[in-house]
Curated annotation (Swiss-Prot):
Described function: Plays critical roles in virus replication, from virus entry and uncoating to assembly and budding of the virus particle. M1 binding to ribonucleocapsids (RNPs) in nucleus seems to inhibit viral transcription. Interaction of viral NEP with M1-RNP is thought to promote nuclear export of the complex, which is targeted to the virion assembly site at the apical plasma membrane in polarized epithelial cells. Interactions with NA and HA may bring M1, a non-raft-associated protein, into lipid rafts. Forms a continuous shell on the inner side of the lipid bilayer in virion, where it binds the RNP.
UniProt subcellular location: Virion membrane; Host nucleus
InterPro entries: Flu_matrix_M1 (IPR036039), Flu_matrix_M1_C (IPR013188), Flu_matrix_M1_N (IPR001561), Flu_matrix_M1_N_sub1 (IPR015423), Flu_matrix_M1_N_sub2 (IPR015799), INFV_M1 (IPR037533)
GO BP terms in the entry: viral budding from plasma membrane
Species whose genome carries this gene: Influenza A virus (strain A/Brazil/11/1978 H1N1)
Protein topology in the membrane: Peripheral membrane protein
Region (RNP-binding): 165-252
Primary residence: virion
Record key words, sorted: Host nucleus, Membrane, RNA-binding, Viral matrix protein, Virion
Pfam families: Flu_M1, Flu_M1_C
Miscellaneous comment text of the record: Most abundant protein in virion. When expressed alone can form virus-like particles in transfected cells.
Protein name: Matrix protein 1
Length: 252
């Protein structure tokens, strides 16, 4: 796996699923391929994206700044600086300085990542802030190692939280989660269907599913009534794709 592929993988792992994630993935691909060279426009676009947490925006801004060639005097962006200040905690800053001194001696991506993984996410963010604000300089490979270690820590905590929700025995939470997933799947079906005549059937199925979820929420239904709703939708989507000549494995 190439270095940039690895960086893209780690960074995208902390971005919530949805149309915005696909958009960010495309931007990262363009940046890594040298197709997008307007850092100012890229940062302005990132700043105004909804849904993303300030830290995720800060990490993406740091990645773009490291990768896109720019004039030396280009102003640093406040939204990135604020996100990478370790919540203003002096302990984070102390640890970040210690980590920075170690990274300065490290020139490889994997070496930097291994060193960084033993620090907290707050210290890692502060260390990125030091480098972003030009208070310290490390090799690009070491900076990417720092970024990937931070993303791994964030993704780990997100995974634990997600696993807790998926394995919860609370029927109301499970019911709502199934309805949210069904609604999201229906929306994706509508986007994938496009405007061809054959798409009408898939659009109809998706529309009915969304109406059903709305009705279930409006009148309040038994927690078991949503079981299998998303899977039914995915089976419909696969049947539609088969008719269109597209063979895809199950999303489940």
């Amino acid at each position: 796996m190439s270095l940039l592929t690895e960086v893209e993988t780690y960074v995208l792992s902390i971005v919530p699923s949805g149309p915005l994630k696909a958009e960010i993935a495309q931007r990262l691909e363009d940046v890594f391929a040298g197709k997008n060279t307007d850092l100012e426009a890229l940062m302005e676009w990132l700043k105004t994206r909804p849904i993303l947490s300030p830290l995720t925006k800060g990490i993406l801004g740091f990645v773009f700044t490291l990768t896109v060639p720019s004039e030396r005097g280009l102003q640093r962006r406040r939204f990135v600086q604020n996100a990478l200040n370790g919540n203003g905690d002096p302990n984070n800053m102390d640890r970040a300085v210690k980590l920075y001194r170690k990274l300065k001696r490290e020139i490889t991506f994997h070496g930097a990542k291994e060193i960084a993984l033993s620090y907290s996410a707050g210290a890692l963010a502060s260390c990125m802030g030091l480098i972003y604000n030009r208070m310290g300089a490390v090799t690009t490979e070491a900076a990417f190692g720092l970024i990937c270690a931070t993303c791994e820590q964030i993704a780990d905590s997100q995974h634990r939280s997600h696993r807790q929700m998926v394995t919860t025995t609370n029927p109301l939470i499970r019911h709502e989660n199934r309805m949210v997933l069904a609604s999201t799947t229906a929306k994706a079906m509508e986007q994938m269907a496009g405007s061809s005549e054959q798409a009408a059937e898939a659009m109809e199925v998706a529309s009915q599913a969304r109406q059903m979820v709305q009705a279930m929420r409006a009148i309040g239904t038994h927690p078991s009534s949503s079981t299998g709703l998303k899977n039914d939708l995915l089976e419909n989507l696969q049947a539609y794709q088969k008719r269109m000549g597209v063979q895809m494995q199950r999303f489940k």
